[in-house]
Amino acid sequence: MRIGHGYDVHRFAEGDFITLGGVRIAHGFGLLAHSDGDVLLHALSDALLGAAALGDIGKHFPDTDPQFKGADSRVLLRHVLTLIHGKGWKVGNVDATIVAQAPKMAPHIDAMRALIAEDLQVEPDQVNVKATTTEKLGFTGREEGIAVHAVALLLRA
C-alpha cells in the first residue's frame, strides 16, 4: 500500500462561481487558474500521483500547454486514475480538507463526495471531504483564495 499527499492553492479572481470537487458553487469571485481552477480535484490528483510515484499534475497537465486551458478537472482526475491503474494500483480511500473562509462548503460536501467517488470508481464511503476556516487568519482568512490538503491511500489492484 502507498500513501500520497497533495496540496493546492488558487487565488480568487473575477467571476461569479467556483468549482470544487466538480460542483459549481455561486460566489462573488472565481478562481484564477489555467484549467477550471478546481483546487480540490487538483490536490486530490497530486495526492494520487504522489502515492503512485508518478510526479504531480504540473508534470502531466502543464499550465504552459494550451490543450489544458479551461480544462475540466474531473477529466484530469479520471486520467490520473487511468495512470495509477496502469501502475497496478487502485484507490483505497481519499481524504481532503478545504481551507476557505467563504463560501460555506457544508451544503456542497455530499455532492462533491459523490462526484469524486464516481470519477475514482470507488464507493462514496471511500471519499471524505471536509472544510475549515482559518478564523480570518492568513490569505484564506482574508478571502484571497482557497487551499486544499488531500491524502490518498493506494492498494495493489
UniProtKB/Swiss-Prot annotation:
Catalysed reaction equations from the record: 4-CDP-2-C-methyl-D-erythritol 2-phosphate = 2-C-methyl-D-erythritol 2,4-cyclic diphosphate + CMP
Similarity comment: Belongs to the IspF family.
Binding site for a divalent metal cation: D8, H10, H42
Protein name: 2-C-methyl-D-erythritol 2,4-cyclodiphosphate synthase
Record's subunit section: Homotrimer.
GO biological process, one term: isopentenyl diphosphate biosynthetic process, methylerythritol 4-phosphate pathway
PROSITE patterns, per the entry: ISPF
Pfam families assigned: YgbB
UniProt: 4-CDP-2-C-methyl-D-erythritol 2-phosphate binding residues: 8-10, 34-35, 56-58, 61-65, 100-106, 132-135, 139, 142
Cofactor binding note of this UniProt entry: Binds 1 divalent metal cation per subunit.
Family matches, as NCBIfam families: ispF
Source organism of the structure: Pseudomonas syringae pv. syringae (strain B728a)
Function: Involved in the biosynthesis of isopentenyl diphosphate (IPP) and dimethylallyl diphosphate (DMAPP), two major building blocks of isoprenoid compounds. Catalyzes the conversion of 4-diphosphocytidyl-2-C-methyl-D-erythritol 2-phosphate (CDP-ME2P) to 2-C-methyl-D-erythritol 2,4-cyclodiphosphate (ME-CPP) with a corresponding release of cytidine 5-monophosphate (CMP).
